[in-house]
From Swiss-Prot:
It is found in: Secreted. This is BPI fold-containing family C protein. The keyword Protein biosynthesis does not apply. GO terms for cellular component: extracellular space. It comes from Mus musculus (Mouse).
Length: 509
């Protein structure tokens, strides 16, 4: 009887494990989507970059020996040196998504014009000169597969790579060029054979893919945002690839700088719309902003202490006519005694993303204190308040521009405190400080903008931001600066302030 129960127990355990695993699904904080339009533009730019690189490629000498039976010569040693690609064309080239795998590159009917120096040596003669080699019917295919490694980095692998040159035509130049050109056609077959054996495009491509993996792994997935927080942008799953797009699902979570502990909430699922009008779509979930709010709160970043002089001097320099109002605050409360204003968050700012509405609600406490003649600090009044603001967003050039507007301001006294005339006046003054002082100054700072990253000199153009239910949607086209020299590494990310520390395993929820 006990033996029969064992399979049943194992089955129950398996079902329970599957249930637990399904309930721990991790959703992204950020999803970046690349569309077919981006591939088409990337192909267009890539061909221009290849034209620049082709002129700098060092091609090894091509040499060998062949028997020329039509001339009754047993063997001729030949050497082609100083080989340079002058021009090439790949009119039938395409990039397409391969669902569940990656991106396929396909090119056929390509041509290339190559100049070279040549020399031949036979038992009865030797000669040298210049020549042009025209290649046609160039065929290339390969798939770049996208995966994710154990540390949250994207990883690439080149699969099914094949290169074939179908035709080669040689034109010789020199004193005996007419003679050589008369029997160039029989020489083209062995040249084509050796050329196909020596074409190293696939190994070169594999080497570049491997170098990309090395470079991307050298970057830290944690980026230091400020003195309080870091941002984790590691991949949480392999890239998702359909016939129409490629999605990168990123962690998109903020952490306190000194403690990589997940916040006490998890991201909710969201889905990007099936639109193909832009090259790039980025979905930034509510979780991204909530984790930023939580990380700054637990790091102690959301608090400040200001003296009468600091407040008056600061606002008199930045807000016309406002400093004179603040200079009278001491008279209102404590006559000629200076005061100290302490403001601190009592919880993480609450983030709410609804369609066409991005709002932040700041719960905080404000304490006004005065310093007596004997240096004793005496509290005047203590209040809790909640300020609700709306957030406006726009992308201008290469910067993300933000602005805040105050929706409502609510003060509340502790239950055992009395609400007298001084408190009412303090409410009015504090509300005025927020309306006419804090928010305008914050907006002045915010409107300087946050620079958007442009790796490999890729910029955002025709950008738009839309607030949807539970996430922000950024749509943009891309532009590549073709005037800059292509870089073989990721130096364009070098200005990011990266945290150099070992990465931990992906958290589970």
């Amino acid at each position: 009887m006990r033996t029969k129960q064992v399979p049943v127990l194992w089955a129950c355990f398996l079902l329970w494990s599957l249930y637990i695993a399904s309930s721990q699904t991790v959703y992204p904080g950020i999803t970046a989507r690349i569309t077919q339009r981006a591939l088409d533009y990337g192909l267009q730019v890539g061909m221009k970059v290849l034209e620049q690189l082709a002129k700098e490629i060092v091609i090894p000498d091509l040499n060998g020996s062949e028997s020329l039976k039509f001339l009754k010569i047993d063997y001729v040693k030949y050497n082609f040196s100083n080989i340079k690609i002058n021009a090439f064309s790949f009119p039938n080239t395409s990039l397409a998504f391969v669902p569940g795998v990656g991106i396929r590159a396909l090119s056929n009917h390509g041509t290339a014009n190559i100049s070279t120096n040549w020399s031949v040596k036979a038992p009865l003669f030797r000669d040298s000169g210049a020549a042009n080699l025209f290649l046609s019917g160039i065929y290339f295919t390969g798939i770049v597969a996208f995966t994710r490694n154990d540390f949250g980095y994207p990883a690439l692998e080149l699969q099914d790579c094949h290169v074939q040159v179908s035709h080669a035509r040689v034109s010789f130049f020199g004193s005996l060029s007419a003679l050589y050109n008369s029997f160039a056609e029989p020489m083209e077959k062995p040249i084509l054979k050796n050329l196909n054996e020596m074409v190293q495009l696939c190994p070169i491509a594999i080497s570049q893919v491997e170098q990309f993996n090395v470079n991307i792994s050298a970057l830290e997935v944690l980026t230091k945002i400020d003195n309080y927080t870091v941002l984790d942008c590691s991949l949480i799953s392999p890239p998702e690839i359909t016939e129409n797009h490629l999605d990168f699902n990123l962690k998109g979570a903020f952490y306190p700088l000194e403690s990589l502990v997940d916040p006490p909430f998890t991201p909710a699922p969201f889905h990007l719309p099936e639109s193909r009008d832009s090259m790039l779509y980025i979905g930034i979930s509510e979780y991204f902003f909530k984790s930023a709010s939580f990380a700054h709160y637990v790091s102690g970043a959301l608090g400040t202490t200001l003296s009468t002089r600091e407040i008056s001097n600061y606002f008199s320099q930045n807000v016309q006519g406002f400093g004179s109002v603040l200079s009278k605050i001491a008279e209102i409360y404590v006559l000629s005694q200076p005061f100290i204003l302490q403001m601190m968050a009592t919880g993480p700012p609450m983030v709410n993303l609804q369609r066409n509405n991005f709002s932040l609600e700041f719960p905080a406490a404000v304490i006004m204190l005065t310093q007596l003649d004997n240096s004793t600090i005496q509290p005047i009044v203590s209040m809790d308040f909640v300020a609700s603001t709306s957030v406006g967003l726009a992308i201008l050039g290469q910067k993300l521009i933000c602005s805040l507007s105050l929706n409502r301001f609510r003060l509340s006294l502790p239950e055992n405190s009395q609400r007298d005339a001084k408190v009412v006046r303090f409410e009015n003054i504090l509300s005025s400080i927020l309306h006419f002082g804090v928010l305008p100054l914050a907006n002045t700072k915010l409107q300087q903008g946050f620079p958007l990253p442009n790796p490999y000199n890729i910029s955002f153009i025709n950008s738009d931001i839309e607030v949807l239910e539970g996430y922000l949607l950024v749509s943009s086209d891309l532009a590549y600066d073709t005037s800059s020299k292509p870089q073989p590494n990721l130096n364009s990310w070098g200005d990011l302030n990266l945290v150099h520390r070992p990465w931990r395993e992906q958290p589970t929820h």
